Amino acid sequence: MISRKTRKIRIGKLEIGGDSPIAVQSMAATQTQNLEATTRQIEVLEAAHADVIRIAVDNEKDVQALRVLRKQFPESVWSVDLQENYRLAPIVAPFVDKIRYNPGHLFHLEKEKTIREKVEFIVNAAKENDCAIRIGVNCGSVDPDYKERYKDDSVEAMVRSAVDHCQMLDEMGFENYCVSLKDSESEKVIDANRRFSQERPDVPLHLGVTEAGLPPEGIIKTRIAFEQLISAGIGDTIRVSLTLPNDDKGQEIKVGREILKDIEEGRFRSVPENFLEGLNIIACPSCSRVENDKFVDLAQDVRKMTEYAEKYKLTIAVMGCRVNGPGETDDADLGLWC
């Protein structure tokens, strides 16, 4: 396995990048303001030894819940997902170790302000509270300006968005950041991260195949991407995104560590013949954005109902939220959005 060349950044008590161990993380799938359910979810992920736990915050009730939860889990390393409301950054920053923002979401809110002004608002909150930042680019919610500019190359649209945001943070004197470029197709994840790392080899990368779906298919998609990237020295922290019941979310950590161990020891698993040529069911891993958790059952039902079509080149997307749901279903032959 080729050694990584990225700089080290600090997320609370954790370091990633450079020669630091590759961190394995997951995300709470419950609505944050549901304290009982979210407490249970954090306990599940801590029991699985998650290095970082990501929690989404969308409104003031979530912020109040986050404040209570932090008192219960003072030692946990937490990342917060700002969703579509970047203005929550200074309110949540005192309770977390990393802030994740999606460049595509900044386009829609407060259009009278420039993207740079919005990014600077987040950066200032991170600086004042000693937080790291993740620039999280997702194929389902790329900034429309980049989608239009690179309409013939969706991977380049993601890469250019990420590189430009890195430049903004650099110009603002902020270096404690990492980047993610996620797609539901393994090949595009590989391509995007390779392109980015060639241009910015110094920036730590968070790897993941978004909406990978149900196991075992979702595990195979993730393994394909991770094997190609990590063996080449690309990747500093990982997330395995699987569509699972909340109490089983610890499996994401277990699977992630198994994949890392296999790569480190030179064991590359064979992929089933024609795996990427037939039916492709995309399903999100659930998070606090989901308003109807029945979508996990729906994804399982869809797989059973479509067994007859497994040889056909079709994509069915089963989404659970308003954030990536619309974008991910755009390119699917059939989209189901709870």
Predicted segment positions?
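Active-site beta->alpha loop and helix N-cap motifs at the rims of alpha/beta catalytic domains
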Residues: E46, A50-H165, L169-D170, S186
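Nucleotide-binding motor/catalytic cores of P-loop/tubulin-like NTPases across gene-expression machines
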Residues: R322-C338
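Conserved beta-strand positions in the central sheet of alpha/beta enzyme cores
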Residues: R54, R100, R134, C178, ...
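Short, acidic/polar
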Residues: T32-V44, E84-P90, A162, G218-E227
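Catalytic alpha/beta core domains of metabolic enzymes, predominantly
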Residues: V123, N138-S141, Y146-V318
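Conserved, mostly hydrophobic/aromatic
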Residues: V24, D81, I135, V179, ...
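Short, well-ordered coil/turn segments that N-cap beta-strands
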Residues: G18-I22, H49-D51, P74-W78, F95-D97, ...
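N-terminal amphipathic alpha-helix/helix-capping segment at the start of soluble metabolic enzymes
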Residues: M1-M27, K127-E128, V271, K304
